[in-house]
Amino acid sequence: MHDLSEPARVVLAGALDEDENVDVLAPAVGSILVLTDRRLIVLRQGAESRPMTGIQSFALDRDLEVRIAPTIKQVTVASSGRAISVFMRREHLGDVESLVAELRRRIYAA
């Protein structure tokens, strides 16, 4: 799990199911988007000290909406009436687009 600090690795490892695999990581400002074999996780910087908001999990189903607004460098994740936004740096746009493309492929292949 590249680009993750040791505390972030520990928090993420604790949030994963025993047999869950991390497939794609995409950095964002103050957070990282994590696509596993069964869900999307938004892991915020400092998650180890804020367990209620530091890690958000979204099931890979057709309720999940992920929108990228490249002009303002914002990613919005919404599902089941809740939504969060993260910002990305221009140099990470390709990583985020790849993660979202893979996420959509998985959702709509089912």
Stretch-by-stretch model annotation:
Residues 1-33, 98:
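Anionic N-terminal interaction surfaces
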